[in-house]
Amino acid sequence: MHKGFRVAPGGWLLLSVLCFFLDVPSLLVVAGNVYIHEMGHLWMLRRMGVYIRELVLSATGLCIVCNTALLSRRREFLCALAGPLFGIASALIVSAAGNLGNNDFLKLFAGAGVILSVFNLMPVAPLDGYRMLRAATPGWAPYVSTLTALLMLVVGLWLMVRGFGTGFAFLGLYLVLRDIV
């Protein structure tokens, strides 16, 4: 149903950064959760009859290249929601298995899955929460996205001043600039 998978130049950069900063178990946690999340989207898109052209690993993560323009707003909402729902359902199952076997790796995997899913529900482009908001209220989505990105930048700067690192501030800055440019 799709032509294949490719890694864009930005995807190689993302892989390099992840490999530099993460150990192998952490890399497996990130890759596994992203895979489960994207499989949720693929499952729903296929149920909706959408042709998947390809999967592309870019600088912003794994992207499904397809034409959703023919989907109704309700169906677009469901396709956007499917990724986070798969992630949360998987996290619940993996968490139960981790607790039963007292397996710290499975608990870490489950926790990362919840974080990825909740983060993806934020109403800021290009995340799934934005796609859901755009499907529900198309006129408001760009404004809510920009305000959310600005809020992330302000919170990130506050966290940075308080000594909690620069990651959230840079993420907020990226999202603000992405909305403006």
Model-derived features: positions:
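Hydrophobic transmembrane alpha-helices and their immediate loop junctions
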Residues: 1-181
